[in-house]
Design a protein with these regions (language model features):
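Active-site or ligand-binding cleft "flap/edge" segments
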Residues: 1-181
């Protein structure tokens, strides 16, 4: 992107992801398409020590270091982190299988999963809280595995991207988040 910016092929050194199930996803380079989101963007500075896509946030009120990753199917934390999160999420039970941690819940309810950046809350919709079923139970779209990432980093994958338009601003070393339309 830096090369395109230097060649004046981009207005700004940024890109914007808006991922949707089915049609309507977009990837914009060089400018922000505000028709893709509601409200204003919430900007969060990126700490260059951690890397560009790693920012501090909260998951259901718990402090979290998060890696923003469009290529991950789930939201992933360590098993310890997931167990701690589930203990504070009514209606969800924790189970382990094959070295992975899972949250399961009655498919007739929708557990509250809220991700916060810069003081703004982004609530996962029912469609994005559940990822499959196990009998009469639904599986939470947040899983636990011990990935070896430093600082027990959460990986914010597809369920977060499906609800939020995200701007990666390289010029100002920040990320912008807004709920999708």
């Amino acid at each position: 992107m830096e090369a395109f910016k230097q060649q004046n092929k981009l207005k700004k050194n940024l890109f914007q992801f808006t991922l949707k199930s089915g049609k309507g996803s977009s990837l914009n380079f060089g400018d922000i398409d505000s028709s893709k989101f509601c409200d204003e963007l919430t900007w969060v500075d990126v700490n260059p020590i951690w890397g560009f896509y790693i920012v501090g946030g909260r998951i259901n009120g718990q402090k979290a270091i998060t890696a923003i990753d469009s290529g991950t199917t789930f939201i992933i934390g360590s098993r310890r982190q997931l167990k701690k999160l589930i203990e504070k999420t009514p209606g969800v039970s924790y189970l382990e299988s094959d070295g992975m941690g899972y949250g399961v819940f009655d498919c007739n309810i929708t557990p509250n999963v809220t991700i916060s950046y810069g003081g703004t809350d982004f609530k996962l919709s029912r469609e994005h809280v559940a990822r499959g079923t196990a009998g009469k139970k639904c599986l939470l779209s947040i899983v636990g595995m011990d990935s070896g990432l430093p600082l027990e980093t959460w990986i914010m994958g597809d369920p977060f991207f499906q609800t939020t338009s995200i701007v990666f601003d390289h010029d100002h070393k920040r990320l912008g988040f807004a709920p999708q339309k």
